């Protein structure tokens, strides 16, 4: 909806790329899923731009939500604006974060929930960073495809955590492999 929100959503995954002209309004981030990967993602999001603040968090378990908040407050004390009324726990915590006035949601819950969370965020008009994978089965993939189409139509962003394909070094390496610079490759010899 606003260029800064698109910038933050993109900066979460691609911090070196500016997707819009920033303004002075601080973007409110909602963090859903406070485990290890979630801690890394929210740390990266708060590091990516000076105009972002963590506004609310959601986690299935209250103790994990509290621990996540405590952990990130130590790393980014000036960028965490989460009061106790915006720390949500339970299986509906994702919806409470989405409804808390955030601009961008960071989805780092277990991937089986991701299609439902993406849909809810897009339906609410939020920008989304969703950790990979976005879905774990065919119905989930179809749901995410529909959410992506809706996000495009309404002008909101969905960015996923699979960012290596966008770095110049990775792209150059891939191009060289396809070009035969290292000889013939065996695709069965790689897992990752």
Regions found by a protein language model. Give the residues of each.
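N-terminal glycine-/serine-/threonine-rich beta1-alpha1-beta2 phosphate-ribose binding loop
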Residues: 2-126, 142-155
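A contiguous active-site-proximal alpha/beta segment in oxidoreductase catalytic domains
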Residues: 127, 134-192
């Amino acid at each position: 909806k606003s260029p800064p929100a698109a910038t933050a959503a993109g900066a979460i995954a691609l911090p070196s790329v500016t997707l819009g002209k920033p303004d002075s309004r601080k973007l409110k981030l909602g963090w859903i899923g406070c485990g290890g990967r979630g801690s890394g993602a929210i740390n990266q999001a708060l590091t990516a731009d000076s105009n972002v603040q963590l506004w609310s968090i959601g986690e299935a378990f209250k103790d994990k939500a509290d621990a996540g908040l405590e952990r990130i407050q130590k790393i980014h004390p000036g960028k965490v604006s989460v009061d106790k009324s915006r720390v949500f726990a339970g299986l509906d915590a994702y919806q409470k974060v989405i409804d808390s006035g955030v601009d961008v949601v960071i989805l780092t819950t277990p991937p089986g929930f991701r299609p439902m969370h993406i849909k809810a965020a897009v339906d609410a008009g939020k920008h989304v960073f969703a950790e990979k994978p976005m879905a774990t089965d065919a119905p989930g993939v179809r749901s995410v495809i529909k959410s992506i189409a809706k996000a495009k139509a309404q002008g909101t962003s969905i960015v996923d955590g699979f960012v290596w394909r966008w770095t110049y070094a990775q792209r150059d390496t891939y191009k060289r492999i396809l070009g035969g610079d290292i000889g013939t490759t065996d695709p069965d010899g790689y897992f990752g």
